[in-house]
Amino acid sequence: MLTVDFARLGLQPGDRVLDLGCGAGRHAYEAMRLGGRVVAFDVDAAAVKDTAVVMEACDGDGAAVNGDALRLPFPDGAFDRVVAAEVLEHIPGDTVVIAELSRVLRPGGVLAVTVPRWGPELANWALSDEYHTVPGGHIRIYRASALASRLSDAGLVVEGRGYAHGLHAPYWWLRCLVGVGNDSHPLVRAYHEVLCWDIERRPVVSGVTRALDAALTPFIGKSLVLYARQP
């Protein structure tokens, strides 16, 4: 499940790519598939270890690195493309992280940043205190204009905006209503199965879910994506 549109990111074979906050590695693997030389970076050592195992089994050039986004261990201009997906909403020092992302992006390079979209995320916070008080969880909600201003303040030129995951916003509203940790609720289980069918591109079902996702995403897509260039 990709949040970033790699066509808009403009990744070319041989590009040096940083996936900051890689988590399970979904964007890192796609960047490798497209021929990028990828560094998957995360503060979670266990996630980095798991991602490294998958990378070793894949064709391509990839490495997984454990570290702190506030102090990236890379030289200035080290990367042609940078992805930071669903990361900034977790970090108190978000402006420091953005400055680091700008620093390691070469002139002419492109950054894709994704965060939870303001409207759907605001609904989650309103429906459940548990959703946003969990340790390591979301500590802020971004308006698109505020995030764009932070990127501009770091010297980047915002060139585009997108949204993703229209089917996922209602899923999280449901989870907030029945209890964020209540994975066994029958409605949650049924909805999750539908999302899995969509991700797995099951015949017939995925055609319906993708049509629904395309219709819903402009209005309630769970994620906001901004694309910015280093001048």
Question: Model-derived features: where do they sit?
Answer:
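Conserved catalytic loop of SAM-dependent methyltransferase domains
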Residues: 160-197, 222-223
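Short alpha-helix
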Residues: 139-154, 161
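Residues lining the SAM
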Residues: 85-88, 114
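Short, glycine-/aromatic-enriched active-site segment of Class I SAM-dependent methyltransferases
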Residues: 113-140, 148-149
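A short glycine-rich, Lys/Arg-flanked "PGG" loop and its adjoining helix->strand segment in the class I
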Residues: 95-110
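Conserved N-terminal segment of class I S-adenosyl-L-methionine
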Residues: 1-75, 81-85, 95-98, 139, ...
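A short hydrophobic/small-residue beta-strand
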Residues: 38, 111-112
